[in-house]
Amino acid sequence: MTQFINGQWVAGLGHEVTSKNPANSEVIWSSKTATAEQVNTAVEAAREVQFDWFMLGFEGRLAIVEAYKTQLEEHKAEMAEVIAQETGKPQWETATEAGAMIGKIGLSVAAYNKRTGSSENDTPAGRAVLRHKPHGVVAVFGPYNFPGHLPNGHIVPALLAGNTVVFKPSELTPKVAELMLKLWEKAGLPAGVINLVQGEVETGKALASHEQIDGLFFTGSSRTGHILHQQYAGEPGKILALEMGGNNPLIIKGVKDTKAAVHDIIQSAYISSGQRCTCARRLYVEKGAEGDALLAELADAVKRIQVGAWNSQPQPFMGSMISETAAKGMVESQRNLLNLGGSSLVELTHLKEGTGLVSPGLIDVTQVIELPDEEYFGPLLQVVRYTDFDEAIKLANKTRYGLSAGILADSRDDYEYFLARIRAGIVNWNKQITGASGAAPFGGVGASGNHRASAFYAADYCAYPVASVEADAVSLPASLSPGLSI
């Protein structure tokens, strides 16, 4: 019973699917997918209760959300372990994700009040009141890299605003989604307010194309996001929020503390086995002796990165990639770059058949004439040597994406020069570019999104403004308009 529809756990009526721990291929979840008919039932259930959920009022909705927060706190260790088993990420990292899910509640409440609450002002024309209303029924499509935190960042703001939700998680992380819904159920969520439909592409298509949804919030690949954008092109009445990937640049310029620089590079490129949308994919290093020394130190540190299973002791820095297919895809991507003229500094290797375990890779692509503008979603960092700062910035901007970018530089002038010219939604200075604050917006430009920043700005796409001019009674104005006699 792995579909949660109208407050009931029901079996899927589609085909059999399984979820495996990518570090050892152990099956940890199995069920049948939701059919198009079950998706329709889920949407209808969400539609049926949406007005009642809205009319519960913000304080009533907040009470349920706060009860969910309590459940997350009580089950934090369980949530972290399920995320670790299903994604392959080390336990230290998934404990952080479970903590972020808890922290999202308070941040979402603050964002609701700051960005989409109510206000009123007296004007000569009457009392001007600003309110916000929910869109209605929204679909949430979750990713596998942060299967708890990222969909949570759509669902919580959507519910606070008064929407009801149909949640379609990644087919690679169904067990995490199931646990999330069990915690919502324990929190006392009314039937139909969140509905869970588990499945693969056909389930997602049935939900995305359903006529009765009012919006879709998606986190995932640029390819799928662009398909959704084309699908919604003729439906201006539906809100579409796309959070996609990036081919993210990191420039190194004039850094004295090379050990600190190496640390920030590793945290930018290899955390989560390179499976964060903000991970650095391209590293720009000055030509010359200082750049050579930095690269040598970086290569040595990359070789010594510990890789292991989610529960290995001592804990590794990198866990498994999401699947063996993903791991082999990274090996193939490295091979393609080598064939184009790249030079391996540290070889990425598939460590064990039947798993997603890979070692991190570092490749010099300076001699590649036409560097593919691809998001290699794994622990493979491309190095480009440069002689001119403007040239480095120009190359950094040579991408259709625009999610994150960063510079490690001792000079603030260099940072401000870079900041003014780089095209990205997240720009960091002397910090890893995988570091982002939940108290700030999160989103990119170009192929990285559609100008619907999430995180603190998620409240913006969860509600629409309603402007009113009000008076307590109908009254004649002091003077009538010309040509009127009443």
From Swiss-Prot:
GO terms for MF: succinylglutamate-semialdehyde dehydrogenase activity
Pathway linked to the protein: Amino-acid degradation; L-arginine degradation via AST pathway; L-glutamate and succinate from L-arginine: step 4/5
Binding residues for NAD(+): G220, S221, S222, R223, T224, G225
Record has Oxidoreductase as a keyword: yes
Pfam families xref list: Aldedh (PF00171)
Matching CDD domains: ALDH_SGSD_AstD
EC number: 1.2.1.71
Enzyme class: oxidoreductase
Active site: E243, C277
Reactions this protein catalyses: N-succinyl-L-glutamate 5-semialdehyde + NAD(+) + H2O = N-succinyl-L-glutamate + NADH + 2 H(+)
GO biological process per UniProt: arginine catabolic process to glutamate; arginine catabolic process to succinate
PROSITE patterns, sorted: ALDEHYDE_DEHYDR_CYS, ALDEHYDE_DEHYDR_GLU
UniProt keyword list: Arginine metabolism, NAD, Oxidoreductase
InterPro entries from the UniProt entry: Ald_DH/histidinol_DH, Ald_DH_C, Ald_DH_CS_CYS, Ald_DH_CS_GLU, Ald_DH_N, Aldehyde_DH_dom, SuccinylGlu_semiald_DH_AstD
Highest taxon above the source species: Bacteria
Family designation: Belongs to the aldehyde dehydrogenase family. AstD subfamily.
NCBIfam families: arg_catab_astD, PRK09457.1
Main function: Catalyzes the NAD-dependent reduction of succinylglutamate semialdehyde into succinylglutamate.
Name of this chain's protein: N-succinylglutamate 5-semialdehyde dehydrogenase
Gene name as annotated: astD
